């Protein structure tokens, strides 16, 4: 039944417009994140930033500052084609006279049929805080993608991987508190050193730290200004080379074998 609390009247210049709240909680709340870290991204912003990159589900993705796991979880949901909001309820579900219950059931069933939960992906999330890593695992479990993500306690200075053409997509500390700002030069230097050791990887990073490029040691290929809530941030994009096409890769493999 439609409640009066779902209706929002707006009076503007003697004209009244009545709007209906169909969602309840804000749409950026997917329903899986009960545990959060100090400075979490909204789920919607994390998903949008991932889609701004050329990452595809056949490429490895690592977040070395995973916090509550938002980037890895959203990436896994994109890869598995899990519709946003599958883990939450909407106010309009209770509107018996406006939206038939069967329509909700049919819509959810259709979304479930399109899911590919058995997909093989390599998505990893690291954080230096063991409790935060534990929270990320719990959030991933609620989202139904815990089997698709490897979470581990690890410092960014220890970031390395043998795979090529991977993606680092991350939200490192901004240093919003004065005492944290003193640690940022060393932290971003470590990010730059770790990235330099990754063969042919791309780095995508959202931060409000304006000296990020200076301490990373190179200028970003692209830089987008984005507001994370009320905080002006920058989405730095350090682009690695594209992987060779399958035919080219096969030819190079044959050449190497012939030379042996």
Regions found by a protein language model. Give the residues of each.
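Short, small-residue-biased leader/transition segments that mark boundaries at the very start
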Residues: 1-8
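A short, glycine/Asx- and small/polar-enriched loop/turn
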Residues: 10-15, 162-166
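C-terminal catalytic and target-recognition region of SAM-dependent MTase-like enzymes
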Residues: 155-259
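Conserved acidic residues
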Residues: 5, 59, 166
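Conserved S-adenosyl-L-methionine
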Residues: 41-160, 176-177, 183
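C-terminal edge-of-domain segments
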Residues: 11-20, 236
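SAM-dependent Rossmann-like transferase core, predominantly class I methyltransferases
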Residues: 18-54
